[in-house]
Amino acid sequence: MSEHIYIFNPEHDLCIANGDENFVPPRSAVGFAKENIDLSEHLRRTNKQSRNIIPWGWNHSLKKRLINEGVDPATLPSEEELQFIRTHSRREFALDVHSRLNCGDSQVIGADYRIVATSVNEIEAFISAYGSAVLKSPLSGSGKGIRFVREGLSESDEGWCRRTLGKQGSVIVERRFEIIKECAMLFECHHEGIDFIGYSLFETKNGAYSRNILASNEDIEDIIAGYISRDTLTAIREGLTSVLADTLVGHYEGFLGVDQMICQTASPVFVPVSEINLRMTMGLIARNQYDNDHN
């Protein structure tokens, strides 16, 4: 189907969060990759990428590993590219992209539902204003680096905040909503631009990925359109394509996913940018698997 070499390295987020090329992922993370090697078959899809090697995600640790295995460094991402990926894997990038979308629709929540806090005082003020919140470290693995708080910070919460501020410089603080549905828009970034690939529909538990639902793009769009208009959904998709292209084209080549949520407030609202993953996602695997099985 393709001459590309695909690498399933789901420990990528941990490597990105650590940042050291000599980082050794926990045995459990490496074990997950080995135990689920069959998933690598669903990484394959027609693409416009120039590199022969297409991993789950690029990071310094993977590059060093490939060089040690004899891969020509000239065929791998440069230091500047890897640093760009790490910088834009921080959760601040999701907030930035959200703030640049111009939806103008009451069904779509604005970017101010969260802040980038650089002090414990800012965090406490936000919680005081909204009663409960979700705290997220800028970089973390799936389900890690996330805390749910209500009515103020406990001693443990405050300690976590201070450590995260010291190590990563900020804490993302979000209003906590009741989640109705979680979905994502999937894209491929290449030297010519950004292409929309499709949707994914998934579930999480306490911030950690749980499972994807296999469904057609049309069926997933129908589900989302039960809460917001198709015109609004189209505007968000086109807006994301434009904003992401402005930032990523020429600096990043690969797949990415923009996680989204439908949440219950006084009425359902759509969060157009919850997280941005500059890597492959389980949603992409689900999309590929469904499309390959039905084409």
Give the location of each predicted region.
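Structural motif
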Residues: 7-12, 56-61, 176
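N-terminal "leader" segments that precede or initiate the main folded domain
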Residues: 1-47
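ATP-dependent carboxylate activation and anion-phosphoryl transfer catalytic cores
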Residues: 231-295
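Conserved N-proximal alpha/beta basic substrate-recognition cap immediately N-terminal to
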Residues: 29-128, 141
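A conserved active-site cap/scaffold subdomain adjacent to cofactor or substrate pockets
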Residues: 198-251
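Phosphate-binding site of ATP-dependent enzymes
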Residues: 131, 156-211, 257, 261-273
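Extended, Lys/Arg-enriched charged tracts that mediate electrostatic binding to polyanionic substrates
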Residues: 120, 127, 138-144, 150-151, ...
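Glycine-rich phosphate-binding loop of ATP-grasp-fold ATP-dependent ligases
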Residues: 113-114, 132-158, 182-184, 206-224
